[in-house]
Regions:
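Conserved phosphate-binding elements of NTP-dependent enzyme cores
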Residues: 1-280, 285
Length: 287
């Protein structure tokens, strides 16, 4: 990247090696985000994704032709309604629905996997339409989500909840911490692979059906990272992460870096924005 001059940058030239983990550090206001977000990210979004974005001033960006994909793992919410949750975002709900649709009780009742979708009218709670909550508009105050009186937050109707796997309904599964779900689905490889990835990024304490609008920025970011890891990588993807270690314990930071290294080992490139060297174990990255 040549001649980056956005905001307080002054004709900055920088080279990021492909196929490695790169880290950009500096105190607040030093220009990290100007360099990587305003210039690099937006320029690549415009060139690779045809997005209409305002790009920070620069002369030229070379070498991006060798990349096939751009993924920005930021702290923006995964959604603003109870339908957006770890199970739906990582798509682990799909094989879980497959499994419930194959249970003997489901077959006896003529249910298919569709019955276990939030969007299936025949299977969901009719009062809250599968959200488990109702939105109360407060007009001059922030709107409030309150638990559905009819399903008590369980999302599905009584007939759907008659189907169980190892004694657990699909509502029980969504109300289950990821670590517990790993134990429940230990015999189901498709489901287990995604759940273990969520554990690896330090989200084992989170419930599978936890509403996306209750997640912190850091949790949303790690959830997005887990979703990427659970997909089969084709390599040649650039990942940009803005301060992913914020609020993490040192053990969680080490775990996160190992996960990022896995992406790099698959032929991808990572660029991380960090405030300080002390927040990262930099021997795993490219100085």
């Amino acid at each position: 990247m040549l001649g980056a001059s956005a905001n307080n940058l002054k004709e900055v030239d920088v080279r990021f090696p492909l196929g490695l983990m790169n880290v950009v550090t500096g105190v607040s206001g030093s220009g990290k985000s100007s360099l990587l977000v305003d210039v690099l990210q937006r320029a690549l979004e415009k060139k690779m994704l045809d997005k209409r974005v305002e790009v920070g001033k620069h002369q030229e960006i070379k070498g991006y032709e060798k990349l096939e994909q751009l993924m920005v793992i930021d702290q923006e919410p995964i959604g603003r309604t109870p339908r957006s949750n770890p199970a739906t975002y990582t798509k682990v709900l799909d094989p879980i629905r497959d499994l419930f649709g194959k249970m003997n009780e489901a077959r006896r009742r003529g249910f298919t996997k569709r019955r276990f979708s939030f969007n299936a009218r025949e299977g969901r709670c009719g009062a809250c339409e599968g959200q488990g909550y109702h939105l109360i508009e407060m007009h001059f105050l922030s709107d409030v989500w309150v638990t559905c009186d009819q399903c008590k937050g369980r999302r599905y109707n009584r007939e759907t909840l008659a189907v169980t796997f190892r004694g657990q309904t699909i509502a029980d599964v969504l109300d289950m911490e990821i670590t517990k779900a790993v134990e429940l689905f230990e015999s189901q490889p498709r489901i287990l692979r995604i759940l273990q990835t969520l554990e690896e990024v330090g989200l084992g304490y989170m419930k599978l059906g936890q509403s996306g609008n209750t997640l912190s920025g850091g949790e949303a970011q790690r959830l997005k990272l887990a979703a990427e890891l659970s997909r089969r990588s084709r390599g040649k993807t650039l990942y940009i992460l803005d301060e992913p270690t914020t609020g993490l314990h040192i053990d969680d930071v080490a775990r996160l870096l190992k996960i990022l290294q896995r992406l790099v080992d698959q032929g991808n490139t990572a660029i991380i924005i960090a405030v300080s060297y002390t927040h990262l174990t930099l021997p795993t990255s490219n100085d």
